[in-house]
From Swiss-Prot:
Residues that hold [4Fe-4S] cluster according to the record: C56, C60, C63
Ranges where the Radical SAM core domain occurs: 41-268
Cofactor note: Binds 1 [4Fe-4S] cluster. The cluster is coordinated with 3 cysteines and an exchangeable S-adenosyl-L-methionine.
Subunit structure comment from the entry: Homodimer.
HAMAP family assigned to the protein according to its UniProt record, in alphabetical order: BioB
Designated name of the protein: Biotin synthase
MF terms (GO), sorted A to Z: 2 iron, 2 sulfur cluster binding; 4 iron, 4 sulfur cluster binding; biotin synthase activity; iron ion binding
Residues binding [2Fe-2S] cluster: C100, C131, C191, R263
Source species: Shewanella piezotolerans (strain WP3 / JCM 13877)
Family recorded in the similarity comment: Belongs to the radical SAM superfamily. Biotin synthase family.
InterPro entries in alphabetical order: Aldolase_TIM, BATS_dom, Biotin_synth/BioAB, Biotin_synthase, Elp3/MiaA/NifB-like_rSAM, rSAM
Length: 350
C-alpha cells in the first residue's frame, strides 16, 4: 500500500463525496488507512473527570452544565487536589493511560492558574498523560499550562461554521479557532472534535471535519460525540441521528485525518456493541473509560473490557512510572489517609 497522504486543503465537496460512498466502500477505505497508521486492535483509553461542575455562563444548547437551563444538575466548586489524585490513581489502576480534567468555565480565571498547574504536575507524577478542557485560553494561559507539563488541551469546534449559531451564541467560532491556535503555539497537543446528532445536516458533519482537517496541523486527538439528550436542555427532544451516519462520520474522520487518534466519545452508553464494533473497524481507536463523562453516563468499565475481549482489542500501554514515582505516590496516599480534607478547593468560586 502507498503511504497515506496528509492534507490540509480539503474541499467540502470532496468530503461530502466520501460521506456518500456505499457503506462497504467507505469502511474498506477507512479501515485500510487505519491499518497503515495504527495497530488496528489497539485502543487508547482515557478517563475524564469533571473538576468543576455546573454554573457555566455559556448557552450551548446540548449542555446540562449551562446555568441557563434547569437540568437538575448540582453545581460544584473546583475539586480539592487529593480528590482529583484519588480519581487519577483509580483511572491508572483501571488501565487508563491519559487523565482528562474538565471544568465548566467560559475560561479559567487567573487566580486558579497556579492551582491548575499544580494539578497537572501532580497527575503527571503518577505516570499518566494529562489533558484539560477549561474553556477558552489566552496565549499566556496556554503557555503556562504547557510549561507545567500539560500534554493535551481539548477545545471542540462542535459543528460546522454554518450550523454553529443554532447551537451556541455566547462565543464565536473564531473564539474556538483562536484557542486551538494558542494551544498549538504553546507546544501542547490539540484535542478537538465535535458533536453529531444535534439536528445538523450531512453537509454540516462534512463541514465540521473540513474545519478540523484544514487546521495548520491536524488535531492529535479527534473526539466524535453522539449527542446525549438531557432533559431541560433545548436539544432534549431533537430527532435521533441514524447510527450509520455516526459510523460514516468516524470513517471519514479517519480517512481525512489519518494520523490522528479518533475517539469514540460521548453517547456510547446508548450504542449497541455491534455499533461500537463498526466504529472501531471504521477507525475509532480511543475511548473514555469509566461510568461517567463529566455529567453524562458512560458504559461500565467491565462492559468495555468484555467488549474488548470479544473483539480482540487491547488497551494502549500507558506511561510507566519509575520506582521513585511509585514510592512517592504510595507515600502521599498514606499521608493523606488520616486526613479529612474537603472535597473542594477553597479558592474555587462557582
Amino acid at each position: 500500500m502507498s503511504d497515506v497522504q496528509v492534507r490540509n486543503n480539503w474541499k467540502r465537496d470532496e468530503i461530502e463525496t466520501l460521506f456518500a460512498l456505499p457503506m462497504n466502500d467507505l469502511l474498506f477505505q477507512a479501515h485500510s488507512v487505519h491499518r497503515q497508521e495504527f495497530d488496528p486492535n489497539e485502543v487508547q483509553i482515557s478517563r475524564l473527570l469533571s473538576i468543576k461542575t455546573g454554573a457555566c455562563p455559556e448557552d450551548c444548547k446540548y449542555c446540562p452544565q449551562s446555568a441557563r437551563y434547569d437540568t437538575g444538575l448540582e453545581k460544584e466548586r473546583l475539586l480539592a487536589m487529593e480528590t482529583v489524585l484519588t480519581e487519577a490513581r483509580s483511572a491508572k489502576a483501571a488501565g487508563a493511560s491519559r487523565f482528562c480534567m474538565g471544568a465548566a468555565w467560559r475560561n479559567p480565571k487567573e487566580r486558579d492558574m497556579p492551582y491548575l498547574k499544580t494539578m497537572v504536575e501532580e497527575v503527571k507524577s503518577l505516570g499518566m498523560e494529562t489533558c484539560m478542557t477549561l474553556g477558552m485560553l489566552s496565549a499566556d494561559q496556554a503557555s503556562e499550562l504547557a510549561d507545567a507539563g500539560l500534554d493535551y488541551y481539548n477545545h471542540n469546534l462542535d459543528t460546522s461554521p454554518e450550523y454553529y449559531g443554532d447551537v451556541i451564541t455566547t462565543r464565536t467560532y473564531q473564539n474556538r479557532l483562536d484557542t486551538l491556535s494558542n494551544v498549538r503555539a504553546s507546544g501542547m497537543k490539540v484535542c478537538s472534535g465535535g458533536i453529531v446528532g444535534m439536528g445538523e445536516k450531512a453537509t454540516d458533519r462534512a463541514g465540521l471535519l473540513q474545519q478540523l482537517a484544514n487546521l495548520d496541523k491536524h488535531p492529535d486527538s479527534v473526539p466524535i460525540n453522539m449527542l446525549v439528550k438531557v432533559e431541560g436542555t433545548p436539544f432534549e427532544k431533537i430527532d435521533d441521528l441514524d447510527p450509520l451516519e455516526f459510523v460514516r462520520t468516524i470513517a471519514v474522520a479517519r480517512i481525512i485525518m489519518p494520523k490522528s487518534r479518533v475517539r469514540l466519545s460521548a453517547g456510547r452508553e446508548n450504542m449497541t456493541d455491534e455499533l461500537q464494533a463498526m466504529c472501531f473497524f471504521a477507525g475509532a481507536n480511543s475511548i473514555f473509560y469509566g461510568c461517567k463523562l463529566l455529567t453524562t453516563p458512560n458504559p461500565e468499565e467491565n462492559d468495555d473490557m468484555s467488549l474488548f475481549r470479544r473483539l480482540g482489542l487491547h488497551p494502549e500501554q500507558g506511561i510507566a512510572a519509575t520506582k521513585e514515582q511509585d514510592e512517592a505516590m504510595l507515600a502521599k496516599a498514606a499521608a493523606q489517609q488520616d486526613k479529612k480534607a474537603s472535597a473542594f478547593y477553597d479558592a474555587g468560586a462557582l
